[in-house]
Design a protein with these regions (language model features):
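Acidic, proline/glycine-enriched N-terminal capping motif
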Residues: 1-137
């Protein structure tokens, strides 16, 4: 199943440590983004893949072309000649998606055996296109 998450792609932030209690927690911005991804999956009619099955995930992160780019550079971005080599790092983008879909698209992210993650420029606002599928043995 494929679904879209509107808004600029974000990466998984490092866990934070509480000085007072000594506990580890996920930053609020990351937790909110994970919730947004999970809601988009469920709103698209997503159903969990059984725990005895393998999962494949494709994540395409689309970033808005900066307004400061020249006409030539914007055109190169539109034709995928220039790609967004910028933050967030691709591994952090993938990690936030995998964690968000835990217990929603699959029981545990250990079921994920195939991944693809790419960064592109978008002619409009930024978004994520995520595809989750069962991988046959």
């Amino acid at each position: 199943m494929e679904f879209i998450v509107e808004g600029d792609p974000q990466g998984k932030a490092r866990p934070r440590f509480s000085q007072k209690s000594g506990t580890v927690y996920t930053p609020a911005k990351t937790a909110k983004y994970e919730k947004l991804i999970r809601k988009a999956f469920l709103a698209a009619g997503g159903k969990a893949i059984p725990s005895d099955c393998y999962v494949g995930i494709t994540v395409d992160a689309y970033f808005q072309i900066p307004k400061s780019y020249t006409k030539g550079k914007r055109l190169a971005c539109q034709h995928n000649i220039n790609r967004p080599a910028k933050k967030p790092d691709i591994d952090n983008t993938l990690k936030v998606v995998l964690d968000a879909l835990n217990k929603a698209a699959y029981e545990d992210d250990k079921q994920v055996v195939e991944v693809s993650c790419r960064k592109w420029y978008s002619r409009s606002a930024g978004y994520l296109r995520i595809s989750v599928r069962e991988v046959k043995q």
